[in-house]
């Protein structure tokens, strides 16, 4: 299911993020299943309660590792510099993604319905990483992180997650939404990395957010598959 918009008020984005929706191009969408080559998987939307977020040794170590880099936050405008960096990133990844940043965010157009910002990470003058996020009134949604593969030892994707969380903390926002994880598909588990203890997971049936735990996700995945199987049986009987 998706929603098309012309301009998005901040409180509108807050509401729909809280209902398990997310940005795709210039629309909002939600889903409970993800079909992949290896099978059908359940999706589980996440958010971090900013006020409860704390860092452990791994997160603090990453801040120290990258402290020589400069960081700036700007309103998003698509530039050749961003596209060049995204192209380098795109060539280095082993999963499906949009071939350009403009295609991913603007779907080939120029109008943006979202209040979008970008975090830049530079080594001197060189842009080495960038993280795009949308702002609501009380929350942000992380849309994409991309980085120079030459700096892979600096874990810049995870670093950008921490920087987005710190941006939300600086502006006293309630939530940072990093997207969904996929049950039994560890490639998405990095979204828990910033602070599992502050992470909540969405339950579409009750429209509730609960503290994250793998036990809860396992039960929710089993329930979703059971409901899907029952629905398929009903359709076959008709």
Q: What positions do the PLM features span?
A:
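Terminal substrate-recognition subdomain of acyl/acetyltransferases
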Residues: 1-68, 178-238
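Short, surface-exposed, polar/charged, turn-prone segments marking secondary-structure boundaries
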Residues: 98-101, 113, 160-162, 168-173, ...
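A short, terminal or domain-edge coil/loop segment
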Residues: 80-87, 154-155, 227-238
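A conserved beta-strand-loop-helix scaffold within acyl/acetyltransferase catalytic domains
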Residues: 27-36, 51-153
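Acyl-donor binding region in acyl/amide transferases
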Residues: 1-18, 103-106, 113-116, 127-199
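A generic secondary-structure boundary signal that marks alpha-helix termini
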Residues: 25, 95, 169-170, 200
């Amino acid at each position: 299911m998706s929603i098309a918009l012309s301009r998005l008020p901040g409180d509108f984005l807050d509401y729909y993020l809280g209902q398990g929706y997310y940005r795709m191009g210039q629309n909002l969408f939600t889903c409970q299943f993800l079909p992949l080559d290896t099978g059908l998987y359940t999706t589980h939307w996440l958010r971090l309660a900013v006020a409860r977020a704390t860092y452990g040794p791994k997160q603090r170590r990453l801040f120290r590792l990258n402290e020589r880099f400069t960081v700036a936050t700007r309103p998003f405008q698509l530039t050749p510099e961003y596209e060049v960096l995204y192209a380098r990133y795109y060539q280095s990844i082993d999963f499906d993604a949009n071939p350009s940043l403009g295609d991913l965010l603007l779907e080939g157009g120029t109008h943006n319905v979202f209040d979008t910002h970008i975090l830049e990470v530079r080594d001197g003058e060189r842009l080495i990483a960038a993280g795009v996020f949308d702002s609501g009134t009380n929350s942000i949604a992380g849309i994409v992180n991309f980085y120079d593969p030459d700096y892979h030892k600096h874990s810049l994707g995870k670093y950008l997650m921490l920087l987005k969380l710190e941006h939300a903390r600086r502006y006293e926002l309630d939530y940072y939404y990093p997207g969904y994880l996929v049950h039994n598909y560890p490639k998405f588990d990095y979204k828990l990395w910033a602070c599992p203890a502050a992470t909540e997971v969405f339950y579409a049936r009750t429209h509730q957010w609960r503290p994250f735990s793998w036990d809860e996700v396992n039960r929710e995945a089993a329930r979703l598959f059971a409901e899907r199987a029952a629905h398929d049986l009903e359709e076959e009987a008709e």
